[in-house]
A protein has these predicted regions:
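Extended charged low-complexity segments that act as oligomerization/scaffolding linkers
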Residues: 1-102
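Detector for Asparagine
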Residues: 4, 10, 20, 36, ...
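An almost-null, non-specific background feature
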Residues: 6-11, 16-18, 38, 57-62, ...
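Aromatic-enriched hydrophobic runs in primary sequence
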Residues: 40, 45-48, 53-56, 192, ...
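Extended alpha-helical coiled-coil/bundle linker/stalk regions that scaffold oligomerization
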Residues: 66-319
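C-terminal domain/tail detector
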Residues: 230-422
Length: 422
């Protein structure tokens, strides 16, 4: 078990005397870590079984772990405890168990989201957060009567005590991360029924409705009450699956549910996902999604994602050569499917969730010049791979000039030191 791969690679290189052998052996070892196939390989006659644990999807762990934690046989003593009527820990266990379908669904979507956005949590981090979600960091002997809603798991998960953010909860890094997402501040299409009409009976079970009514007595007019209602809704709503799917888009992103469908193998990439990629490419290179042409000019441009008014064309990509497919992540992650852009049946480019969400914003005209470095790297890597596929080595120069009506192509000829524009 190696926590830091740098010393492993360097130490392995010291087994060899020849400089070329050292570099070759290092590259083979790095390649094996990237492939993560779980096969025994030989590097310079040394047998290796390389498993890159950090690349193994662990997002299924939280729900499996929590399903064991809430088993009734583990809580038998609590049912006879003198504090059982006001113990938030015991109430959290019962509430989670009664509503585990929706609770597990939200937890799964949340941890996948964090992983896809580069915040892969360790098993330790996840268990810390789930333990805090159950207990709030309070020992049994310290439990005293309190408004129960304040210490319910839907608040503790995000680091709140009722409507108030708990500064001490920020010491649990996974809780701090959940808080900093501010999911509970996002407007939902369910807000009208949840916050304005207060149609609790249509949104929650009678048990949860009772919790909300009791909480309203002291918290209804406090700042942060609407956010607490949303936190309750995330974990405990009983709305139809289609309505919850819609709300999931509001909480996370518009493309998230279709991305999850492909990631989990429930469906193949859709035509709408292909059109999203095509529209995003047009926005990146042409500054508009409107085009009468079946081709997309691939140009040299700066790394801002904003189309320049004048660009040098290095090739063209036919929309018929664009496919969006799904492929297994790796031999050790067979249940996880990656969304892949395939160009001309040969070049394959992995599409991450941040890239998909960025494409959605780009298509809608939302241009950001301050994007995450990891996302920026993914976009520029894709552009470089597209350039490799479509590049044509030619003496002819072609430019595109963007205007209010779209763009026009200009051919440049250089003959006897004279430049001609056609």
């Amino acid at each position: 078990m190696v926590a830091n791969t740098g010393p492993l690679i360097n130490t392995f290189g010291k087994l060899f005397d020849d400089e070329n052998e050292i570099e070759q052996a290092k590259m083979q070892l790095i390649g094996a870590m990237d492939d993560n196939k779980g096969d025994i390989i030989k590097i310079a006659s040394y047998p290796f079984l390389v498993i890159n644990v950090a690349a193994i999807d662990n997002t299924a762990f939280p729900t499996k772990y929590l399903s064991n934690v809430i088993k009734d046989e583990l809580w038998a003593d609590c049912s006879t405890c003198q504090k059982r009527e006001y113990c938030h820990i015991f109430h959290n266990q019962k509430l989670i168990k009664t509503n585990q379908g929706r609770v597990f669904d939200f937890l799964s979507k949340y941890y996948i989201w964090e992983t896809e956005y580069g915040h892969r949590m360790t098993i330790r981090s996840m268990t810390e957060q789930l333990a805090y979600m159950m207990t709030g960091g309070v020992e049994c002997e310290d439990i005293v009567p309190i408004d129960l809603h304040k210490m319910m798991f839907f608040n503790l998960f995000f680091g709140y005590v009722g409507t108030i953010q708990n500064a001490q909860a920020q010491n649990v890094l996974a809780v701090k991360l959940a808080y900093e997402n501010h999911f509970d501040q996002k407007r939902l299409r369910a807000d009208e029924d949840l916050i304005i009409k207060r149609s609790y009976d249509e949104l929650f079970s009678p048990e949860v409705v009772a919790i909300i009514h009791n909480a309203e007595k002291t918290s209804m007019f406090l700042k942060g009450w609407a956010e607490e209602l949303r936190r309750i809704y995330f974990f405990l709503n009983i709305v139809p699956d289609e309505s919850w799917r819609r709300d999931t888009e509001d909480v996370f992103s518009k493309q998230y549910t279709t991305y999850l469908d492909v990631r989990g193998g429930a469906s193949k990439p859709s035509k709408s996902q292909k059109m999203l990629i095509i529209d995003a490419l047009r926005m990146m290179y042409l500054g508009t999604v409107i085009s009468n042409s079946n081709t997309i000019p691939i140009t040299l441009s700066k790394e801002s994602g904003i189309a320049q008014s004048v660009q040098l064309v290095v090739g063209e990509l036919s929309v018929n050569d664009i496919e969006v497919i799904s492929k297994p992540d790796s031999a050790l992650n067979m249940e996880k499917q990656n969304l892949v852009l395939r160009v001309q049946k040969k070049e394959e480019i992995k599409l991450s969730l941040p890239m998909i969400d960025y494409f959605e914003e780009l298509r809608n005209g939302v241009i950001s010049t301050n994007i995450d470095p990891q996302l920026s790297h993914g976009i520029e890597s894709m552009k470089a791979q597209l350039l490799k596929v479509v590049y044509i080595d030619s003496d002819d120069l072609e430019m595109i000039v963007l205007n209010n009506n779209g763009y026009e192509k200009i051919n440049i000829e250089i003959d006897d030191n004279v430049i001609r524009l056609n």
